[in-house]
């Protein structure tokens, strides 16, 4: 059993959600980085995550953002975190290469929680390809 500090969430407002890094990158990260309007992003992300538009739309959407930002969403007065400056699709090979080189993880076969992925991503060294790109 892991200590409580290492428990990874698998629910948003009591509803089970996907946790795999690739799912979050594809169905939330790319939508947030898309040219869709904020209203379209809102609906697409809710439908992707819950397969419906929940009754408490705003609360569920905020829950998705909290999950996506690993419990530490940016505040209005803070600059966007570096991961928002990249294009998950365009930068995929850089990210894959950096995970292989610096963490010994092959993202083509790896299964891990989104928060684990982001923890490793954020800890990549400044000389990594992706950190140089952003």
Locate the predicted segments by residue.
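Charged interaction scaffolds used for protein-protein
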Residues: 1-23, 30-134
